[in-house]
């Protein structure tokens, strides 16, 4: 998953990512709402069932980011393929291709849980005018996207 922020100036900046192989979704004792600890044990691996929604909790790695008034938050769910400049993953071969659906309705809800810190001061009141001013935080034009069901 990739978390990005839509800025008030119409740009979108990368915030942070999280990775989970869905077959390794079993969480261990000691997990919390903000920190799902996965067992990653071979005996706990379980393929995704066909035509059924299951919970897969993905940790978004620690970060600090100021969300200013007028900003948006976007969570993109994707397979870990060649969408990273420096990191790639060896994906299991899927002879018939692979698709996944993310529930986003009352009967199959999804949620994004983020920690919040109040009372922090000292950060600029506006975003940097140079979209790529923050190191390792690429930025681009924000493109509106609407979730649609797979056909």
Where does each model-flagged region fall?
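Glycine/threonine-rich phosphate-binding loop and adjacent beta-strand/alpha-helix elements that clamp
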Residues: 1-151
């Amino acid at each position: 998953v990739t978390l990005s922020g839509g800025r008030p100036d119409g740009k979108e900046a990368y915030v942070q990512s999280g990775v989970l192989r869905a077959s390794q979704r079993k969480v261990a004792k000691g997990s919390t709402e903000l920190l799902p600890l996965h067992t990653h044990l071979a005996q706990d691996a379980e393929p995704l069932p066909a035509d059924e929604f299951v919970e897969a909790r993905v940790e978004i790695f620690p970060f600090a980011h100021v969300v200013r008034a007028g900003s948006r938050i976007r969570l993109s769910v994707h397979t870990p393929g060649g969408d990273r400049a420096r990191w790639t993953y060896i994906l299991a071969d899927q002879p018939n291709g692979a698709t996944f659906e993310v529930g986003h309705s009352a009967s199959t809800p999804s949620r994004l849980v983020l920690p919040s810190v109040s009372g922090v001061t000292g950060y600029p009141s506006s975003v940097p005018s140079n979209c790529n001013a923050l190191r390792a935080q690429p930025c681009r034009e924000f493109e509106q996207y609407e979730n649609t069901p797979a056909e």
